[in-house]
Amino acid sequence: MSHSGADPEQRQQASEADAMAATFRASEHQHIRYNPLQDEWVLVSAHRMKRPWQGQVEPQLLKTVPRHDPLNPLCPGATRANGEVNPHYDGTFLFDNDFPALQPDAPDPGPSDHPLFRAEAARGVCKVMCFHPWSDVTLPLMSVPEIRAVIDAWASVTEELGAQYPWVQIFENKGAMMGCSNPHPHCQVWASSFLPDIAQREERSQQTYHSQHGKPLLLEYGHQELLRKERLVLTSEHWIVLVPFWAVWPFQTLLLPRRHVRRLPELNPAERDDLASIMKKLLTKYDNLFETSFPYSMGWHGAPTGLKTGATCDHWQLHAHYYPPLLRSATVRKFMVGYEMLAQAQRDLTPEQAAERLRALPEVHYCLAQKDKETAAIA
């Protein structure tokens, strides 16, 4: 239909009428989706995946990591920056970060002389947790019992630091693309005297939903995704892995327990075993997607601790976020710049397309499959 003779307002109205008459397809037409957990929107522009890529290409990292490097401060027996020598650990190893962003004895900034210049005290502790004594392994290449030991250590440090601090943030940055400067398998744990911004948003959203509907937001969300199935990646007896309806990063996933669980220490032995198994499968799929050690940032969110530990916090549901940056290949990543920084998040691949691709991937790591083929060829 031609609208060339109409005035601008008529053309706008006619254009809107044409758009309404068209059949909407999420995989072809741009739209915005709401994230009820963090009270924000994301622009989905799936048609952009058809454009040729002429942007930055990251170098492929083919460097072999030595199993043990005496100069690597995370290795067993190595000397760290503060002069302390690591024990010869053979499992997980937790220690105080030598360069902490939070310290327990920081002074109070005092009162502000103007409402536009507010500062408040920030205290806490920062720890580093090594997952394994070897530098040349990552979580998907570790055994299920080894991953289970990591989960137990996560639960223990949450309980320990949560006795004093209202928020304990466990997070892993994997890969140089995510700013990880050391290839040794490890995560960080920051406990703070305040509730960080994202935790505050999740607290408000879950509290509001629970007040309005009488059930935890993420527990209900998990049930709905099990019914709809199109965004599921993995399911097990106790856990669900899915690409959220509101995902921002290309292959972002959300890891949820099937039952109502508020914090990591509440997981029973069967749930911890099952979590180790499904984590290994998810991270193997990630690596298999582009046959690379898949970079990501991940972290756990649970009910606030400290003085809130004894509170019911029934609106909270434990969950883990995985935010991987890769989009088209092992060397092409998603950049959060421009529109994302100044307006709102935007993604190209739909969450349903991402989930379908992840679902279809094998659960045997490509490195192990390659070794099996080489062994068979020799035999």
Swiss-Prot record:
**EC id:** 2.7.7.12
- Record-annotated residues binding Zn(2+) 2? E202, H301, H319, H321
SUPFAM superfamilies (UniProt xref): HIT-like
Q: Which residues bind Zn(2+) 1?
A: C75, H184
Tell me the Gene Ontology biological-process terms attached to this UniProt entry.
Answer: galactose catabolic process via UDP-galactose, Leloir pathway; galactose metabolic process; glycolytic process from galactose; UDP-alpha-D-glucose metabolic process
The reaction(s) annotated as catalysed by this protein in its Swiss-Prot or TrEMBL entry are:
alpha-D-galactose 1-phosphate + UDP-alpha-D-glucose = alpha-D-glucose 1-phosphate + UDP-alpha-D-galactose
Give the family from UniProt: Belongs to the galactose-1-phosphate uridylyltransferase type 1 family.
Q: Identify this protein by name.
A: Galactose-1-phosphate uridylyltransferase
User: Organism source for this protein?
Assistant: Mus musculus (Mouse)
